[in-house]
Amino acid sequence: MKTVGHRLGLPELLILIGSCSFIFVLWLSAYFEPDIRWLHFFQAWMYFSAIWLSAHRSRWGYLIGLSAAGLWDYINIFVTTFFRSGLHWLFAWVSTGQLKHVDQIIAVPAWIGNFLVVAGSVWAYARLPEKRRGDLGRLALAFVLTTGFFAASVAVCQRRYLPLFRGIIHPHRPW
């Protein structure tokens, strides 16, 4: 694995900002709902890995970031109503001035943070000087491993969320 220094370019900065935003939302969510703390602890490690590897300009960091963050945003558009509900309560707060359901509103910055990770990962990979024939296989492996790690974390820490994985295979727009 060849690395090129520690200087962050704009794509790596997007990965860093998006990941840190999402990790903060994971922490905040765990504050509101203590029984998901362990799940969010393990989930955050995928983002720490993406940050560290991306800061070292490793394609694995970009692939992990794309896989983990892409899956989270996909789930929240096609499987759950969490993001939609967050938007609803955010707009209600803006229009009425009454803050309600912060536990739902945090889905919006979480989704945006993950989108930044996806955008930064795609951009960083696109500017790599050499693309390898095996990179598509590496992306598939990163997706399988991050999804498997997430599924194992859910199975151990919060079994009630396991049906999300069925929804990944049979997506719909729950709006």
Locations of regions flagged by a protein language model:
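Membrane-interface helix-boundary motifs at transmembrane edges
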Residues: 2-8, 52-63, 126-138
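C-terminal TM-helix exit segments that contain a strictly Trp-centered aromatic cap at the helix terminus
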Residues: 71-86, 149-162
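Interfacial segments of alpha-helical transmembrane regions
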Residues: 12-17, 56-70, 137-144
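Alpha-helical transmembrane segments
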Residues: 8-25, 143-150
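Hydrophobic cores of alpha-helical transmembrane segments in multi-pass inner/ER membrane proteins
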Residues: 45-54, 106-123
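C-terminal membrane-adjacent module
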Residues: 118-175
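Short aromatic-rich membrane-water interface segments that cap or initiate transmembrane helices
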Residues: 94-109, 174-175
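Hydrophobic, membrane-inserted alpha-helices
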Residues: 20-26, 43-51
